[in-house]
Amino acid sequence: MSTATFTLGIVGARGYTGAALITLLTAHPAIELIFVSSREYHGQPVAAHNPTYRGDLRFETLDPAAVAAKRADVVILALPNGNAAPYVHAIDATAPPTLIIDLSADTRFDPDWYYGLPELTRHTYTGQKRISNPGCYATAMQLAIAPLRDQLAGPPQCFGVSGYSGAGTTPSDKNNQALLRDNLMPYALTDHLHEREVSAQLGIPVEFMPHVAPHFRGITLTANLWLQRPLTREHIKILYATRYANDPLIDIIDPPPWVNQIAARHTVQIGAFTMALGNKRVVVVATLDNLLKGAATQALQNLNRALGLDELTAIPYHPKPPTSPLPSSPLAS
């Protein structure tokens, strides 16, 4: 007999993020996974696609009414952008107490939904049952900028590079390994959705230029920050370390972080802190796994907090710098 306290279902479980969610939830001591919805995998055992899951569940094809009828304590929507609304409306009508966590961008600009970037917004959580999970790039940008947000002299300029898993499983140029081989693919160089998301959340204009790289997972976000007054590198490092001192998933390191050191980890690494001549410009680099802290891990943080559990329940984190040697920046002060 299950000793789980809360029942949970995933809609859109076939994708990379859905798979990461199943892996995390399988190890959660207070969650019972009761359905996973996927049209492509309909009828197939979940265990056949995710070796960490050892139960008997099979993937189902569930329309919004069928999802609502399950009356799960929690529903996680891991759907492509533009598909969340019918499920939200059905749950609102049939099972309004259900906690909904939406991983798409559909609800990130809706003031009726709590925007769940725990390290920056947990103080505004007051028991909301509708939670919008931030975007992967948006998470990296906000964490890289926030400690200096009030000392900026102009819009942050952010250069982002993501592994192709960020483009999802539906075939496109951005996840075509043949096109990406020996390549870096720029796209949506102005007005990217995450640019608007970060600008709205931080309350300042942000400029963002995303690129897709040949590696599978992980984001490198380089933020160019102009300052109102000169600050020393040490002072800036202290600002970041102090801001995130009580956040176990945020790792402040000295050198620029490398994306291959963050893959399959639940933490964010922020480092470099490279000063330009005159100390009124600093370049900060953040890395995270787009499938974990950029999606599934963050959803689990939000779920845990909403259910009254420790925020890091079932998140296997090791918040310390990697042991592999990283090069120091030649421009660091």
Swiss-Prot record:
Gene3D superfamilies: Dihydrodipicolinate Reductase, domain 2, NAD(P)-binding Rossmann-like Domain
Annotated metabolic or biological route of this protein: Amino-acid biosynthesis; L-arginine biosynthesis; N(2)-acetyl-L-ornithine from L-glutamate: step 3/4
One annotated Gene Ontology cellular component of this protein: cytoplasm
PROSITE patterns: ARGC (PS01224)
Alphabetical keyword list: Amino-acid biosynthesis, Arginine biosynthesis, Cytoplasm, NADP, Oxidoreductase
Alphabetized SMART domains for the sequence: Semialdhyde_dh
Keyword ATP-binding: no
Protein localization: Cytoplasm
One Pfam short name: Semialdhyde_dhC_1
Reactions the enzyme catalyzes: N-acetyl-L-glutamate 5-semialdehyde + phosphate + NADP(+) = N-acetyl-L-glutamyl 5-phosphate + NADPH + H(+)
EC number: 1.2.1.38
Active site: 136
Signal peptide stretch: none
InterPro entries: AGPR_AS (IPR023013), AGPR_type-1 (IPR000706), NAD(P)-bd_dom_sf (IPR036291), NAGSA_dehydrogenase (IPR050085), Semialdehyde_DH_NAD-bd (IPR000534)
One GO BP annotation of this record: L-arginine biosynthetic process
Domain of life assignment: Bacteria
Predominant localisation class: cytoplasm
Family, as annotated: Belongs to the NAGSA dehydrogenase family. Type 1 subfamily.
Function: Catalyzes the NADPH-dependent reduction of N-acetyl-5-glutamyl phosphate to yield N-acetyl-L-glutamate 5-semialdehyde.
NCBIfam families in the record: argC
Listed name of the protein: N-acetyl-gamma-glutamyl-phosphate reductase
Organism (species): Xylella fastidiosa (strain 9a5c)
